């Protein structure tokens, strides 16, 4: 059976800003749950992993930067959207032989994420 990833969370100084950033780029649906100090994120699609964005309630060090890859059909178009929304491209495009290619970017708070385009079969 394995151990599939079933959820993700981003710790953020400004959850509303970060949620808006990802919603604009990927069309993710974000539901603000103020009673939980939490934003539930639905990524859509079959087999997608949903998650949440939260502002830590306690001061101190936050957990380490989390990196996950988001499947897209056009790396160049998403790079353009990321820049327009205030993000920065860190790795333009890199091939993974026999598998596909990826881009690494940071959101407005400097959190690194990846875009993934699988090789056409």
Q: Predicted regions span which residues?
A:
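Catalytic core of tubulin tyrosine ligase-like
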Residues: 22
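Conserved short beta-strand elements that form part of the metal-binding/catalytic scaffold
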Residues: 28-63, 112-117
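N-terminal beta-strand motif that seeds the catalytic metal site of vicinal oxygen chelate
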Residues: 1-19, 47-48, 65-68, 117-121
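Vicinal oxygen chelate
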Residues: 5-13, 31, 58-121
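Conserved beta-strand positions that form and line the central face of beta-propeller blades
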Residues: 7, 40, 52, 92, ...
């Amino acid at each position: 059976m394995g151990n599939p990833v079933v959820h993700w969370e981003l710790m953020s100084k400004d959850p509303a800003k970060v949620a808006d950033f990802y919603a604009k780029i990927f069309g993710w649906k974000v539901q603000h749950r103020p009673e939980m100090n939490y934003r539930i994120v639905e990524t859509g699609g079959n087999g997608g992993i949903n998650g949440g964005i939260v502002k830590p309630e306690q001061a101190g060090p936050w957990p380490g930067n989390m990196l996950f890859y988001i499947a897209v059909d056009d790396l160049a178009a998403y790079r353009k959207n990321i820049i327009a929304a205030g993000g920065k491209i860190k790795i333009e495009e890199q091939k993974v032989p026999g598998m596909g290619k990826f881009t690494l970017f940071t959101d407005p708070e400097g959190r690194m994420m990846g875009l993934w385009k699988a090789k056409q079969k």
